[in-house]
């Protein structure tokens, strides 16, 4: 089975994340998309970052009606800080019959060369890239790599930061969130302080 790993803090997950995940599930050469919730880094200030389990719960709520999109907490069980190359090695051991690929925005591709052991990732895994609006110059060398697949996905410029700030200001951003996620956030008074 071909699995696309879509990493994120998902703080909160929003319709933009789902549009990209669903597009990859339907139009890329992938059987499933695993939305990997990244754990809180204890070295970083927590501020508005919800607890790992709360963010995972929102991903469950957002994806429960999608047969090809699954939540994943795989990085919660790995040593911190979490590096993608370690996560991929762990998944390969745990699921030897699966083929794992990464899903990332064009903005992340531009900094891939800074990732730990990025050459190992490129050698062993395909990377599906979706477009993002950016002022940074393109990494043409990486974009032409045979393991990089640029997918003509919709450009969705919604940010979790914008959503959190809007909730804090009392704005109605309900259309930007899956209904069950909005209810969960509203019921628990998340991001209001």
Curated annotation (Swiss-Prot):
Domain of life assignment: Bacteria
Keyword entries, A-Z: ATP-binding, NAD, Nucleotide-binding, Nucleotidyltransferase, Pyridine nucleotide biosynthesis, Transferase
Molecular function per GO: ATP binding; nicotinate-nucleotide adenylyltransferase activity
GO biological process entries: NAD biosynthetic process
Presence of the UniProt keyword Amino-acid biosynthesis in the record: no
Record flagged with keyword NADP: no
Pfam families in UniProt: CTP_transf_like
EC number from the UniProt entry: 2.7.7.18
Matching InterPro entries: Cyt_trans-like (IPR004821), NadD/NMNAT (IPR005248), Rossmann-like_a/b/a_fold (IPR014729)
Root EC class: transferase
Catalysed reaction equations from the record: nicotinate beta-D-ribonucleotide + ATP + H(+) = deamido-NAD(+) + diphosphate
Pathway info: Cofactor biosynthesis; NAD(+) biosynthesis; deamido-NAD(+) from nicotinate D-ribonucleotide: step 1/1
Family membership noted in the UniProt record: Belongs to the NadD family.
Function description: Catalyzes the reversible adenylation of nicotinate mononucleotide (NaMN) to nicotinic acid adenine dinucleotide (NaAD).
Protein name stated in the entry: Probable nicotinate-nucleotide adenylyltransferase
Protein source organism: Flavobacterium johnsoniae (strain ATCC 17061 / DSM 2064 / JCM 8514 / BCRC 14874 / CCUG 350202 / NBRC 14942 / NCIMB 11054 / UW101)
Lineage of the organism: Bacteria, Pseudomonadati, Bacteroidota, Flavobacteriia, Flavobacteriales
Gene this chain is encoded by: nadD
């Amino acid at each position: 089975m071909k699995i696309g790993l879509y990493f994120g803090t998902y703080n909160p997950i929003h319709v933009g994340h789902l549009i990209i995940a669903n597009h990859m599930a339907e139009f890329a050469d992938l059987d499933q998309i695993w939305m990997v919730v990244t754990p809180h880094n204890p070295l970083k200030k927590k501020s508005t970052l919800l607890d790992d389990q709360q963010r995972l719960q929102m991903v469950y709520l957002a994806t429960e009606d999608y047969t090809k999109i699954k939540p994943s907490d795989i990085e919660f069980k790995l040593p911190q800080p979490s590096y993608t190359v370690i996560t991929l090695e762990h998944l390969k051991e745990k699921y030897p019959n699966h083929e794992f690929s990464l899903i990332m925005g064009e903005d992340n591709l531009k900094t891939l060369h800074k990732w730990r052991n990025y050459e190992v990732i490129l050698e062993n895994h395909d990377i599906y890239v979706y477009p993002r609006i950016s002022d940074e110059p393109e990494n043409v060398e990486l974009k032409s790599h045979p393991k990089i697949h640029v997918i003509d996905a919709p450009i969705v410029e919604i940010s979790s930061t914008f959503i959190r700030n809007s909730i804090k200001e009392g704005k109605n951003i309900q259309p930007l969130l899956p209904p069950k996620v909005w209810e969960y956030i509203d019921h628990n008074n998340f991001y209001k302080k």
